[in-house]
Regions:
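Intracellular helix-loop hinge segments at the cytoplasmic ends of transmembrane helices
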Residues: 67-73
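C-terminal transmembrane helical hairpin of 12-TM major facilitator-type secondary transporters
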Residues: 20-66
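Residue-level hotspots within transmembrane alpha-helices of multi-pass secondary transporters
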Residues: 8-12, 99, 133
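Multi-pass alpha-helical transporter architecture, strongest
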Residues: 39, 122-155
């Protein structure tokens, strides 16, 4: 729910101050942190609420920096193709990952019907680590080629 308000806020921060790759790194680190914490055997509703709030911040940070960064990296004549490929990959993930996670949850369901989500959260944390790596690669590539990911969009 927080991403509804936070994504435009973070987008305006990116427009004004830049630091797109940094915002993606921070968001990816927060995402990973939350899933690692959820994988731990801690049973606290207060912690769960705090972690969900942090997750909302992470889900606001990453797209607010990712989408406006695409035209900085991809030539204008290939921008439609680039966005199409991004949505294509995203839709593959939306189609296949829930099936995989469902199988993992089913395999981790005890005879009493209680599901152990440790492996599921570890998978999501691994996706977060991949996002961190990709974000750092974008930062390094931006420094090398000068795409302007760290520069503001509005002057």
């Amino acid at each position: 729910f927080g991403t509804i308000f936070l994504t435009p806020l973070f987008g305006s921060i990116y427009d004004k101050y830049g630091k797109g790759a940094t915002l993606m790194i921070i968001g990816s680190c927060l995402l990973t942190f939350v899933h690692v914490m959820f994988a731990l055997p801690i049973n606290s509703w207060v912690l769960a609420i705090v972690l969900m709030l942090i997750l909302g911040i992470a889900f606001g940070l990453v797209p607010s920096a990712m989408w406006p960064s695409v035209p900085k990296i991809i030539p204008m004549k290939l921008l439609g193709t680039a966005y199409a490929l991004i949505f294509y990959i995203q839709n593959i993930g939306l189609a296949l990952i829930p099936v995989w996670i469902g199988k993992v949850n089913q395999a981790n369901t005890g005879v009493d019907g209680v599901i152990d989500y440790t492996q599921t959260m570890t998978i999501f944390a691994a996706f977060g680590v991949i996002a961190i790596i990709i974000s750092f690669l974008l930062l390094f590539e931006d420094k090398r080629k000068g795409y302007g990911l760290q520069k503001p969009n509005v002057k």
